Amino acid sequence: MPRMSETLAIELGLARVSEAPFIARMSRDYIEHGLAWRWQTAQIRGLIQDKESVALCARTQALRQQDPVSATPYRDGDVLGFGIMTYGLETAHLMLLAVLPRARRRNIASNLLDWLEETAITAGVSRIELEVRAGNTGARSFYRDRGYHERDYLAGYYSGQESAFRMARNLRKS
């Protein structure tokens, strides 16, 4: 009997404190790999609870399958990606953004960033800044395609081990 394809729906919602350990592991594995682990569970939990931050998750919604025998790699409510942004009076800072490798190329990162940017606009923020590894050409390209520009080169930014670019996007029209 042939296996039918799955239908996967994604919903965005605020991160739950109970998800902090998983988000921290995602940060370690997909953002901080090769560096000292900075964004551990306690730090993520703090950002989730911080009134000046938004921690957003992309989760799977109810999965519909035509063939009940088919194995699926996702369960309802699985976290597939997350983004965390802090908000100041004029500037927001994208702290972390990651999507599980098996869930990439589904516009999850774009949807997370759209939501966080809209929240920044609603809050009256005029600019978003972020840092990205200098060697992460895929992420740098993603952000450039989204209207961010490389503002500063930060030599040794990551614990003296790796350099970064500070990128920024102006939200107000000139």
Give the residues covered by each predicted segment.
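Residue-level detector of beta-propeller blades
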Residues: 79, 150-153
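C-terminal "cap" of GNAT-fold acetyltransferases
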Residues: 3-8, 55-57, 126-129, 133-140, ...
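Short, P/G- and charge-enriched loop/turn segments at secondary-structure junctions
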Residues: 43-45, 152-155
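Acetyl-CoA-dependent GNAT
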Residues: 2-8, 14-104, 110-119, 123, ...
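Intrinsically disordered, low-complexity N-terminal regions enriched in serine/proline/glycine
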Residues: 29, 73, 86, 142, ...
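Conserved glycine-rich acetyl-CoA-binding loop
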Residues: 100-114, 121-123, 127, 133-141, ...
